Swiss-Prot record:
Lineage, highest ranks first: Bacteria, Thermotogati, Thermotogota, Thermotogae, Thermotogales
The protein's name in its UniProt record: Glycogen synthase
Top-level taxon in the UniProt lineage: Bacteria
Enzyme class: transferase
Residue sites binding ADP-alpha-D-glucose per the record: K15
Organism: Thermosipho africanus (strain TCF52B)
Record carries keyword Glycosyltransferase: yes
UniProt function note: Synthesizes alpha-1,4-glucan chains using ADP-glucose.
Primary gene name: glgA
Amino acid sequence: MKVALVSYEVYPFAKVGGLADVVGALPKYLKNFSVEPIVIMPKHKIVEKNAEKFSYSLRKIKESISVPYLKTDEKFDIYQTFIPGTQIPVYLIANDYYFSAEQVYEGPDLAEQAIYFSAAVFEALKVLGEKVDVLHINDWQTGLVPVYLKTLYKDDEFFSKTVVLLTIHNLGYQGIFDSSYMNFSGLPDYLYNIDGIEFYGKINFLKGGILFSDVINTVSPTYAQEIQTKEYGEKLDGVLRLRSSDLYGILNGIDYDEYNPETDKRIYVNYSLQEIEKKYENKKMLQKELNLPQTNDVPVIGMITRLVDQKGLDILSEVLRYILNMDVQFVLLGTGDKKYEEMFKDIEKEFPDKMSANITFDIVLAQKIYASSDMFLMPSRYEPCGLGQMYSLRYGTIPVVRYTGGLADTVMEYDEEAMKGNGFGFKEYDSAYLLKAVARAVDFFKNKKGHWKKLIENAMKTDLSWERSANEYVKIYNKALNKRR
């Protein structure tokens, strides 16, 4: 089975968020399931800048390719590289007009850019002679790929057996643009209606992806259910309910080589479950680095996040002072809304021995927080998958979360009698329940040492591997292929 993963960002070539990590890692693990993966992405400016940093080279292999149907004469070249350490080819679509911005999601016209890329994918595959069984597209930027496949390319013999899987990483971003882009796209006018890509007088690229893909998944089973409700559906819940029988939830994995407490060079001291006392050496060194009193008797609560409402900052702001009045230390890393940046800085001044507010993004400090904290806080309003809780589990740091999306699928409430579970949480999006969950975790840390040790063991034994995820993806590739047979 040949699968082309199509994405705007892929680690290490261009990364803005978690999407890049997913598309950079998944192909490596698909190979273990008799899948032949290739990757297609735009050649953003940042891709060339990252080449030296991540030791990969770019080679131009095709040039001056036209994109029929579109109202443009812009041609594209194709560059090739490989996912580092593998022979998995990455094909980059290069065009100086559309992909000349410094960053991934920038450019003179984001709608035209996404339309151009989506249509160029088909011409690139033909020129390369890459007959793929599955086009695995990601988020709204690639949402028109299945629309082109089922309309303008439906009689093209080259794609007669090709199916599409759409992965929705965050339903909050949909690619909604003025209806005038229909003309540029070359897509048939009949698509501009409520059963097509029309959306409240505009066009919606993600809606096109949902309606025209053979199968759809999102990045956790719980989020797949949530987005079919009015509360989480972002006005697409009706469309998603329509496709309910083709909608799946697959948790992302994490890269076990990259996130490994036994070998991670970014943390102070390496450790394993067998040498868990070395985790506490990390804790003391983090306390020292951040000017907090060095003690193991007080739990360190870590939080690495964008400082926005979605991440639960509104309810946390109501109870943070109550939390700091417990015998705890709180370490924050992140940037975002100015009001929250200032709030954390103000609270740090009030509680200098208990609070360390690091208003920045620092990948090394992030790893140190995952490894050195006792607890990791994620009170999100919604969380499609969430990676923070996975990293913290891997490092034996106990998550305290709101049970939503991927958080509900990865964190299991600790059961004292059965000694099962790997964390603590709350369901109701309310600051009182958040406070209660933190208090419960602090109580276990201070007064139930045997249970705390068991929690760490359960956390570090949780299966968060890409192997598991890749196996699930192969199952739905096959479901899509069976639909077309």
